[in-house]
């Protein structure tokens, strides 16, 4: 059954839930918002927390899922809740002040690439608050371009696009746009602009198979392909939470001179793994990350 003949009930409820979150959480006093999201994280951590989160963190810490410390599960869910609390409140925060407060370690890597007229691909995992990093970049450089998955229903997708556009991001749809996103991203790089791509998960046929914490997964080919095609610098970036603040770092440019997409993506995976191992609680991955965790049907579609 659909609501108004257009949107499935589940999708409508999800969309309305996000709409309420952006409206209500933004209006809450900060202490109240922290209390609400903290309570939600503690509730989610009951009985060992989400099984997929536990399985993912087991790879990071090198232990069986049952031996992943409960403290890490609780810290991970608290970090995830903090991301969403900040996401709901970020549009109303003072972006200029945030741009002055935040400090990005080794940002000169990025500035040097842009000074040389090369453009830059910033590749990130889902860690810390990547939207906050985007706000910093907008305030200290200007708009950049990113890509968003086309969520269902369309109203939910539009809500996320409008949220990120309100922060100063240019957002391209992964599918269904007027032009393929790769084409537009390549143009931005040729124009010596930065692009930011979430880059640790692409469990589709187009993903590049890599070793990640000793096990096979697939990651997007886009960062490597864009750097090869345009000559742009490819930088791994990591975000994490630092007490009540935010940690962000740009790592040295990856060598893309080989033109080997698989080798370059593996180098990116290795950098991500080292960073996630350092800040495991701040890696927000509650979905299957490794091929072994997929259903038989999905593995068959991948040809594995």
UniProtKB/Swiss-Prot annotation:
Hexadecanoyl-CoA binds at residues 126, 164, 206, 229. Keywords: Acyltransferase, Cell inner membrane, Cell membrane, Lipid biosynthesis, Lipid metabolism, Membrane, Phospholipid biosynthesis, Phospholipid metabolism, Transferase. It holds the Pfam family Lip_A_acyltrans. It is found in: Cell inner membrane. Its EC number is 2.3.1.265. One of its GO terms (molecular function) is acyltransferase activity. Pathway: Phospholipid metabolism; phosphatidylinositol metabolism. Changing residue 182 to W: Loss of transferase activity. GO terms for biological process: glycolipid biosynthetic process; phosphatidylinositol metabolic process; phospholipid biosynthetic process. Belongs to the LpxL/LpxM/LpxP family. Monomer. NCBIfam families: PRK07920.1. This is Phosphatidylinositol mannoside acyltransferase. It comes from Mycolicibacterium smegmatis (strain ATCC 700084 / mc(2)155). The lineage of its organism: Bacteria, Bacillati, Actinomycetota, Actinomycetes, Mycobacteriales. The gene is patA.
């Amino acid at each position: 059954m659909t609501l108004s003949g257009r949107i499935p009930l589940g999708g409508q409820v999800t969309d309305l839930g996000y709409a309420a979150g952006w409206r209500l959480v933004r209006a809450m006093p900060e202490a109240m918002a922290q209390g609400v999201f903290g309570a939600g994280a503690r509730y989610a951590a009951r009985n060992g927390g989400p099984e997929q989160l536990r399985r993912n963190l087991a790879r990071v810490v090198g232990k069986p899922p049952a031996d992943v410390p409960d403290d890490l599960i609780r810290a991970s869910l608290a970090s995830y809740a903090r991301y969403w609390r900040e996401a709901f409140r970020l549009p109303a925060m003072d972006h200029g002040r945030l741009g002055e407060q935040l400090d990005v370690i080794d940002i000169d890597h990025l500035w040097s690439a842009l000074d040389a007229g090369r453009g830059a691909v910033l590749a990130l995992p889902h860690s810390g608050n990547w939207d906050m990093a985007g706000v910093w970049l907008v305030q200290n450089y200007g708009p950049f371009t990113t890509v968003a998955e086309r969520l269902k229903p369309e109203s939910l997708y539009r809500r996320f696009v409008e949220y990120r556009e309100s922060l100063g991001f240019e957002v391209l749809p992964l599918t269904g746009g007027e032009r393929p996103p790769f084409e537009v991203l390549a143009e931005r790089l040729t124009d010596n602009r930065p692009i930011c791509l979430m880059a640790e998960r692409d469990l589709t046929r187009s993903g590049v198979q890599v070793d990640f914490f000793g096990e096979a997964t697939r990651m997007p080919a886009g960062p490597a392909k864009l750097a090869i095609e345009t000559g742009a610098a490819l930088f791994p970036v990591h975000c994490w939470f630092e007490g009540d603040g935010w940690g962000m770092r740009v790592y040295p440019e990856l060598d893309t001179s080989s033109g080997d997409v698989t080798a370059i993506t593996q180098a990116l995976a290795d950098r991500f793994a080292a960073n996630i191992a350092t800040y495991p609680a701040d890696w927000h991955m509650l979905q299957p990350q490794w091929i072994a965790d997929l259903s038989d049907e999905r593995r068959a579609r991948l040809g594995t």
